Amino acid sequence: MSSQPGDPATLPAQSSLSFTQGFLLGQLSVVLVLAAFIKFFIFGEAPPPPSRGLSHRSATHRRSNSIYSNSPQEAGSRSLREKPSTSNVLRPVPSSSTNTRSILRKTYYSAIPTNPAKHGRLRIHHSSHQPESLDWFNVLIAQTIAQYRQTAYSLKDSPTSSILNSLTAALNNPEKKPAFIDKITVTDISLGEEFPIFSNCRIIAVDDPNSDGGRLQALMDVDLSDDNLSIAIETQLLLNYPKPCSAILPVALSISVVRFSGTLCISLVPASTPPLDTPSHSPSPPTADTATSGRSKPGDKAGGNQPRSNGSTEDPAGGNPPKTSPKSNVAFSFLPDYRLDLSVRSLIGSRSRLQDVPKVAQLVEARVQAWFEERVVEPRVQVVGLPDLWPRMGRTGVRTGDDAETASNGPRSTVSADIGGSARHEELAREPEALRFRGLLGARPPFDVASRTSSFNVETGDLRSRSMTRQESSGDLSDQLHIPGSLPEAVTPG
């Protein structure tokens, strides 16, 4: 008898087969899922982290691929196929990489509007970027100035490196000092106590025919208020007619910088840039090449220096100037809308003295203003060579301290300098009352105008400091004030 399709004997066999297939498929799927999880999540490589700051920038600020970013296979095959000569080892720098707009785009500075030049004038392109406060720059500048002041005070007794000797030699230059002025003696120098404050820094682009795409220039406001930045001198006016030294008029001056404010302009001058044009009546500003060979300063109008071309300074022997490799320079200047407030005090005469003559103050202020404008006020600039920043063992130093000693266990070079150490102990050992240097006193007592505690003598109408009061009490002042050939005693101040 044949079995029917609905026979119960065949149902357990079919159900067991379907159960086995389902079980095997389930186990296989679990194994595949575990294998995929282990491969891609445990042993897989983590994606590279995004560059900091790039995720928050717009698509227009993305860095463009460099022309040198070729694949390693192409670079390797090209280096094997091509054998460049020695002169072609260094790849040329494309003009697009040094363009002003390219630099601003790659440094994520805001774009500048296009303003064409009119009537051949240089057009300034102002940027919409927010100005910077320069707080960090003020700290660095303050530390540098403080170190210069401390170094100048520590070298005050040096016969060659003293700031007093340097100023005395500069003021008594025979090529610049007139014949009717006797030797100038520096009686008081104060390097100040405050520091300049820089703020509101912004980058602008200036049209320059010597560079592709113009020239970038940094503008920053500077302000300095310091009553202790002063210098006091003494000299004598000589009357050489009808005979030499027929009359002598003692003069004492003190100049203090009350306040200075202006806009500082800083720009880079590449080595390939031709020398800057200067007016015919003043020499061109020295570059890094001429600063080492010739020590002449620009704009010495009073000294009678003739204009020289940039880089054509000859040595004293009359030979050709030393040829050095061109270097990049930094040019800085101030805009004409600066403010320089000076305080000039004067004493004229030996016995009967004229104090704070207004005409003398006007002449001194005008001369200082002219000296400043001839050197660092637009269109004149000061050009300073950039230092060599390549790391060298001769300039390598090791900081003192436990952290530095434990971090580096290697042998130290014999030329390594110990930064700090003895200099720091000497600074703590001596605590100067003020950064003030006094020169040798001449036949007359010094004119101490930097000190704000001087008293006014009503009887004689002159200024007398504490040191002068002590000399008067000793009875030696009358002998010291007697100068042969001075004006007679009958002359009284008008």
Swiss-Prot record:
State the taxonomy lineage: Eukaryota, Fungi, Dikarya, Ascomycota, Pezizomycotina
Q: Which loops or segments lie on the Lumenal side of the membrane, by the record?
A: 1-22
Going by the UniProt record, its keywords in alphabetical order are: Endoplasmic reticulum, Lipid transport, Lipid-binding, Membrane, Transmembrane, Transmembrane helix, Transport
Query: Domains: what does the record tell us?
Result: The SMP-LTD domain is a barrel-like domain that can bind various types of glycerophospholipids in its interior and mediate their transfer between two adjacent bilayers.
Transmembrane parts of this sequence: 23-43
Q: Which residues lie in Pro residues bias regions? A: 274-286
Q: What's in the GO CC field?
A: endoplasmic reticulum membrane; ERMES complex
Q: Does the keyword Transport apply?
A: yes
Q: Which Gene Ontology BP terms does the record give?
A: mitochondrial genome maintenance; mitochondrion-endoplasmic reticulum membrane tethering; phospholipid transport; protein insertion into mitochondrial outer membrane
Subunit-structure text: Homodimer. Component of the ER-mitochondria encounter structure (ERMES) or MDM complex, composed of mmm1, mdm10, mdm12 and mdm34. A mmm1 homodimer associates with one molecule of mdm12 on each side in a pairwise head-to-tail manner, and the SMP-LTD domains of mmm1 and mdm12 generate a continuous hydrophobic tunnel for phospholipid trafficking.
| Localization per Swiss-Prot or TrEMBL | Endoplasmic reticulum membrane
Record topological domains on the Cytoplasmic side:
44-494
Q: What is its main location?
A: endoplasmic reticulum
Where does this protein come from, organism-wise? Aspergillus clavatus (strain ATCC 1007 / CBS 513.65 / DSM 816 / NCTC 3887 / NRRL 1 / QM 1276 / 107)
Q: Region Disordered: what ranges?
A: 50-98, 274-330, 398-426, 449-494
What are the SMP-LTD domain coordinates in residue numbering?
130-387
Q: Can you name this protein?
A: Maintenance of mitochondrial morphology protein 1
Membrane topology term reads: Single-pass type I membrane protein
